[in-house]
Amino acid sequence: MRGWIKLLLLLVYLASFHAYYRERIEALGIGLPLVLYLGMFAVLALALLLAAFSRPGWLRWSLALAFTVSAIFLDAYNRITDSYLTYSAFVSMVYAGGFVQEALQQYHYAITLAAARALLLLFGLGLRPGPTPRLPWLLPPVAPVLGLLALIAILFVRAGEGARGLPVMYTPLAYLSLFGYETLHDHVGPRQPVTLAQAGPAMARDIVLLIDESISGNYLDLNTPAGVTSHLGQAQPGVSIVNFGYAASIANCSADTNVTLRYGGTRTDYLRINSTQPSIWQYAKRAGLGTVYIDGQRTGGNLQNLMTETEKRDIDQFIQFDDTPVVQRDMAALERLVALLKDGRPQLIVVNKVGAHFPVHDKYPDDFLKYQPALPRGRYVDIADTGTRDGFDGRPQDWVLYRNAYQNTVLWNVGEFFRRLFAEGDLSQAVVLYTSDHGQDLHERGNPGLNTHCDSDPVPEEGLVPLVVIQGEGLRTLDWQAHLQANRNASSHYNLFPTLLKLMGYDGTAVSALYGRSLDMPTDDPFTFNVRFNARLGAKPDFRHIDLGQVVTPASVLAGQPMPVGKAD
């Protein structure tokens, strides 16, 4: 009797994904691919049912736990993003592990639903089966392993593709196996030393790369009149502000963008460059600059965005804010930046701000509650990197609350940040390059899902970021105005690394040959961001072009009719 109950639990669990299977069947249509899909589905489903009859309890429960955790991962991802988990997206999730606490808090409702459904799988596999059919004793525990190996083989030869529509508990385990294999075997060579020649000294005493978090270019007033006040669109005493308008990010996930900003990967060769070429820190030290990293996101010395201990050794000052609440982290980073700008030392300063990464419930003080109604506040103000998602399930009204909370956060962590920087900072000997790691999908179009970025099939806003140069008014650095008209709304993150190297005094011709065009040249950028950054096993990157005519702005949302950038304001 217990055996039949177990089978019923597993069949009910499998059947609960009927819409997932139907979508795949409809996409394949009638033909050989459908036959192959149905055959693989039958093999994996049968292997799962056989696993339920494994005799050793420890083995049965081990299989149950592994499959359950895997199923929860994929089910929750599908609920959150309303899209399929590709292998590239899986790798990006692994690299974004530093945000796991925020993700659990942000998406706890979707994860809870996935976990509740997975209880059917857990008990269907784990409960003692009782009397079993006459089966070879090795078949039940070996069958799911063989099924998993078969799926891994398919994914390997198809560059990570081929699991769509199959029983969900196998896919993340197969992805994890492939990722482990690649980690062990993919080595493109050792890190190289700096070989570029310098044409002269650094052009400024302080060179600053200011990387915001989750700040979408279409929500700031410097590009959209109805956007949030940034203080970047108005003249400021003693400084020159050059607005390059909208820019394309490297990718729509933090780790992918940040590691490329630090190593200078190009669209055509980023995997090799990021893995083997010198870091921005190495270039700075060769140019005679000190190196400072201000990390507002992590604490306790924990590294993120694919930074390693080896890379960290080239950083002279590694700054985090262990005892500072999240809501004050960007202001703490500002205070340290202001102090560094005044110390008279030549240095490269890279800042990772808190910005507006989810959750945004409590990332701004009460005085900045301008956009209302907003998400509920006050429950986690003393806990770093957490927030609440109670009552948020992705309905249109929920996204209204989210967008308002997001704009309040931007008003504080961008607007107030720059107001204080211009008021307190000595920028007379500094050049600051400001951007964000990626944009945001705030679901202005009413598209389904709970996700804001890292989607495998994103809206263009996920790759849309601001790009601004700020420098002391009397400084003679690069000629930002030379090609500004052509480069405005037409450049990308890929232009930043060569710009930084030229500011450090490296030979421009050599820099361009290795890393591409800087912002003082016609960038001729394709204006794309990469949604398959972790292109593995022979797969190709997937660069998505941003059509500014399709980007939604706050003004169009307020008007109740999403409109193109060029027309909304």
Name every feature range the model reports, one short phrase each.
Residues 208-209, 409-452, 500-504:
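Metal-dependent active-site segment of extracytoplasmic phospho-/sulfohydrolases and closely related
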Residues 148, 155-387, 464, 493-506, ...:
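Active-site-proximal alpha/beta segments of enzymes that process anionic O-linked groups
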Residues 2-11, 25-38, 51-60, 68, ...:
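Membrane-interface soluble catalytic domains
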Residues 264-266, 401-402, 477-484:
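Flexible glycine/proline-enriched surface loops and loop-helix/loop-strand junctions
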Residues 268-271, 323-324, 402-407, 456-459:
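A short acidic, glycine-rich active-site loop
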Residues 223-227, 428-430, 435-475:
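Histidine-centered active-site microenvironments of extracellular/periplasmic hydrolases
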